[in-house]
């Protein structure tokens, strides 16, 4: 089986397990993610943190994002601007949310574009080395590469439910390993990146 086919199969399996969680299990786990993340993720006042508006059966990190705002973070959310590019628009209290592509919501096109210092990254599956499988469009890989081209090295924390862990994610040259994974069981530093 090719790496692409293996990734697709791992994505399908991990999403099926995540989808099988009851709504109550997802809510409880999401609240635990907030409690752990709010306590363990270091945020300096003014630090730019990108989050994501949950789609489908994803972890709901909105409580965590607002906890990080209370610690002084400036928040932003991804917006799909075309088939290959996402930008991060500032999330300001009281601003209306609009459809931002890929089934997500966020600030409209008039919002300020920010470069995140810390990225809370959605994923379909992850392994203990910090490799992730996204949803297949490559938006985050390209966004991270663009930040690197600007000399910005955002701290990358994958956020998922513990059931989304797989034994091994095939790693391709363009894939960027995560510094840590946050699940309802804790914030785990990933050994391959040496961060945290």
Spell out what each predicted region is.
Residues 136:
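Short polar/charged helix/loop
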Residues 2-116:
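N-terminal active-site beta-alpha-beta segment that forms phosphate/nucleotide-binding
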Residues 2-5, 16-20, 106, 110-119, ...:
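Surface-exposed, charge/polar-rich loops and edge strands
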Residues 54-57, 124-128:
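Short glycine-rich anion-binding loops that position phosphate/pyrophosphate groups of nucleotides
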């Amino acid at each position: 089986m090719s790496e692409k086919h293996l990734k697709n199969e791992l994505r399908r399996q991990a999403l099926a397990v995540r989808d099988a969680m009851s709504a109550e299990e997802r809510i409880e786990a999401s609240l635990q993610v907030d409690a752990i993340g709010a306590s363990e993720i270091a945020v300096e006042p003014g630090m730019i943190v990108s989050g994501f508006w949950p789609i489908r059966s994803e972890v709901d990190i909105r409580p965590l994002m607002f906890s990080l705002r209370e610690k002084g973070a400036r928040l932003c959310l991804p917006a799909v601007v075309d088939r290959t590019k996402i930008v991060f628009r500032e999330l300001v209290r009281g601003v209306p949310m609009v459809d931002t592509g890929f089934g997500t919501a966020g600030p409209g096109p008039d919002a300020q574009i920010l470069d995140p210092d810390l990225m809370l990254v959605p994923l379909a599956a992850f392994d203990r080395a910090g490799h992730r499988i996204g949803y297949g469009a490559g938006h985050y890989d390209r966004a991270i590469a663009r930040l690197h081209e600007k000399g910005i090295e955002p701290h990358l924390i994958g956020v998922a439910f513990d059931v989304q862990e797989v034994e091994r994610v095939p790693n391709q040259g363009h894939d960027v390993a995560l510094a840590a994974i946050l699940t309802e069981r804790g914030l785990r530093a990933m050994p391959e990146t040496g961060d945290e």
